[in-house]
Amino acid sequence: MLNTKNKFMKTILFISTITLLLSCSNSQNSNSTISIDLDASKSISINNIFSKMEIIPLETNEKSIIQNIDKIIEYQSFIYILDRRQKAVLIFDSHGKFISKINTIGRAPDEFYLLEDIVINRFANTLECLDPMGKILTYSLQGQYQSSIYLPHPPMAYHYLHILNQDSILLYTNPTKYNDYTFRIFSRQQDTFVSQFMKQKKIINGECRQPIQVYKDSIYFTQAFSNEIYKISNDTLLPAYQWDFGKYTYNLSKMKFPDLTNPEEQIKFYKEVMYSSKIPYTLGFNSQNDRYLFCSLFMKNKILNILYDKTTKRKVVFSKSKEDIGLYPLYMDNNKIIGITDETLVPLEPLENTQNIEIIKKEIIYTLTDYSNPILIKYIFK
């Protein structure tokens, strides 16, 4: 079975001497600051937040095997899983039945060299896949190839995309010393960039799952090592809100770093600094819906989940519930959070023994092996 903990650590702990986006002008402040006492973590009942949970084993066969889950999208009764390691998108129905796999590697128009991101184009009702080498491939919702777009160079690579409208595509490039800009807007009609924005400065950088989020047609941007959440407006990043974790809050711009291009210095940095009092957490996942602001902090040996009720201002901080149920989030919308099981962080057994749980295809649960596909959990909000 997929080792999600090791996968996460490899992703989030990747540190290099690249860059972090500059903060907006010092004169600009966030519209709101949410102060959270991380020491106030409580083992609340999972039923206080969620009306029910669904356990969905993903079908395992020769074609559907998943190596890593890098992104999940749920759309129109389909579940789309990006697996960067095997350069594939796997499509399942809402009950975990395997539908199809996109895995056409090559240089032809209907092929890709790598896969870095996927999104749903709601204007055309299609799936868009990003080859970081400069190509966007369009597929039907069932995975049939339709067309390709070739992107300009520079930059050397692209890492995330979002469909702004029928014509415009927002593209994000991980900062490096060779890049001027992090964000670009590409016009399909003009076949070129119509805007480039946000410069950077050298510092360390890590990866937050789904750094680009959409809520009510607004686009938000999150970084693993920053509590500041930005809203993308036209060709500008504006502070939207920020998390304040009190004594645990840190500021990379005020830290001194060794030469992280040196392997020995990297190893030392991992051992002595990451998940220590200097950098006690990374922002692993951040999102929102009509009711909640939500984030997950990845700390040493645990995930700390934070829910902030926009209306009541109530704050919930928990690692595991009273029922010993954890939450490893990969997707969130107005109705639910989708996560996965994990041997250490979110074991399956407490889920099976709790109330308000629905197990899809229960017979599969009893035949799982180390080679079985991951198990998804839908946490349905009250």
Regions found by a protein language model. Name each.
Residues 132-179, 196-201:
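Asp-box/WD-like beta-propeller blade repeats and closely related beta-sheet repeat scaffolds
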Residues 35, 78-83, 125-131, 167-175, ...:
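Short beta-strand elements that form the blades of beta-propeller/WD-repeat-like
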Residues 59-63, 97-124, 131:
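Blade-loop segments of beta-propeller domains
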Residues 22-23:
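C-terminal motif of bacterial Sec signal peptides marking the signal peptidase cleavage site
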Residues 68-70, 113-118, 155-163, 204-211, ...:
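Repeated scaffold domains used in trafficking and secretory/extracellular systems
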Residues 242-254, 311-334:
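Conserved blade-ending motifs and adjacent loop-strand segments that build the rim/top face
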Residues 28-59:
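Blade/loop signatures of beta-propeller domains
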Residues 54-87, 282-285:
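Beta-strand-rich domains and repeat architectures in extracellular enzymes and scaffolds
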